[in-house]
């Protein structure tokens, strides 16, 4: 996951990590995490802090080292910037701007991307994403489909 980050992002995260790592020992404890979160106006409980650490503490030692921190940041970034990207992608597919992606619109975009799909393949893609069964994909269905891949 962290391999999807640019050099610039990694160096920014290194700075952020140093801010968290108050005693400079190369790891972030729940206490250090709490201090930084509170300075950012958050008020996490001890249990929440422990959960945050456990979520990314790959080696299970109770602290976060830099590689674990990078993984956490990469996850967060994927989650946030994907929302914007998904909105943009939906607009690309929804040619007529009516809030729905039809089979024809899907076929058109896929063809432009160099994916020659049969009618059956296009219908199958629509069916997989079409939760409410109206034969087209609305924004919610599109988001679900994009986040589940």
Swiss-Prot record:
GO terms for cellular component: myosin II complex. Ca(2+) 4 binds at residues 130, 132, 134, 136, 141. InterPro entries: CALM/Myosin/TropC-like, EF-hand-dom_pair, EF_Hand_1_Ca_BS, EF_hand_dom. Ca(2+) 1 binds at residues 21, 23, 25, 27, 32. The modification N-acetylalanine is found at residue 2. Ca(2+) 2 binds at residues 57, 59, 61, 63, 68. Pfam families: EF-hand_7. One of its GO terms (molecular function) is calcium ion binding. The keyword tRNA processing does not apply. It comes from the Eukaryota. SUPFAM superfamilies: EF-hand. Keywords: Acetylation, Calcium, Metal-binding, Repeat. Residues 8-43, 44-79, 81-116, 117-149 form the EF-hand domain. Ca(2+) 3 binds at residues 94, 96, 98, 100, 105. Calmodulin mediates the control of a large number of enzymes, ion channels and other proteins by Ca(2+). Among the enzymes to be stimulated by the calmodulin-Ca(2+) complex are a number of protein kinases and phosphatases. Belongs to the calmodulin family. This protein has four functional calcium-binding sites. This is Calmodulin. The gene is CMD1.
């Amino acid at each position: 996951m962290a391999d999807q980050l640019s050099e610039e992002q990694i160096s920014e995260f290194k700075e952020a990590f140093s801010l968290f790592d108050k005693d400079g020992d190369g790891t972030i404890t729940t206490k250090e995490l709490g201090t930084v979160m509170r300075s950012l106006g958050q008020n996490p409980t001890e249990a929440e802090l422990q959960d945050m650490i456990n979520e990314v503490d790959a080696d299970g030692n109770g602290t976060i080292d830099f590689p674990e921190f990078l993984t956490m940041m990469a996850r967060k970034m994927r989650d946030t910037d994907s929302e914007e990207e998904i909105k943009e992608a939906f607009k690309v597919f929804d040619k007529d701007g009516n809030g729905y992606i039809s089979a024809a619109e899907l076929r058109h975009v896929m063809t432009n991307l160099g994916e020659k799909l049969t009618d059956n393949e296009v219908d199958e893609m629509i069916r997989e994403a079409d939760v409410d069964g109206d034969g087209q994909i609305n924004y919610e269905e599109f988001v679900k489909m994009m986040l589940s891949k």
